[in-house]
Amino acid sequence: MPYSFFKYIILINFLTGACSGPKQAYTVRELINGKFKADSSYIYSIPFKTGKNVFVIQGYETSFSHKGERALDFKVKTGTLVCAAREGIVTSVRKDSDKGGLKPEYLSEGNYVIIRHADSSTAWYWHFKKDGVLVNEGDMVTDGQPIGYSGNTGYSAFPHLHFEVQGRDAAGNYKQLATRFYTREGAIYLRPLRFYRTRR
């Protein structure tokens, strides 16, 4: 059995846990079970080309590497076009790394893009391939604009895109936020181990 496939099977076995985290207007368990209240939060686009089917390999609070985190991992091939999930201004990028793996020293080696939105929240996109970032600091980007090509740099077991949004919660604290996305089923919170089709 190829080692990469073995790692993938191990990861699947970890992706079943979901524990409650700090409240926004709901708990993570409520999100994962599809039980949440009426919500007025911003609706994001899944960060890929419109019409693409993508697989969410890790969701909020899943136990492989997202325990305590409100972040999503999309399992995609290296070189998959990544698009902005919301318009904003690019505040930071890295594009020169070619290092990746599960060693602690790779935690700071991922290529990334950070985009600040009109409400001061920021979207973080991680693990782009070397020289695969298409934007620069200070660029204005629109929803759906290409920003780079996915890869496997940084702390990563396989090619994927790590996506998270950070902003103010109901108490005014700056932290990771669970976010809704446009899908064929409407505006929903994405759940792990499911396919979704990108739409805008």
Task: Please state what every model-predicted region is.
Residues P2-L11:
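Sec-dependent signal peptide recognition
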Residues T16-A18:
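C-terminal motif of bacterial Sec signal peptides marking the signal peptidase cleavage site
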Residues Q58, S92, H127-K130, Y149-N152, ...:
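A residue-level detector for short acidic-glycine micro-motifs
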Residues S121-G144:
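Short histidine-centered loop motifs in beta-beta connectors
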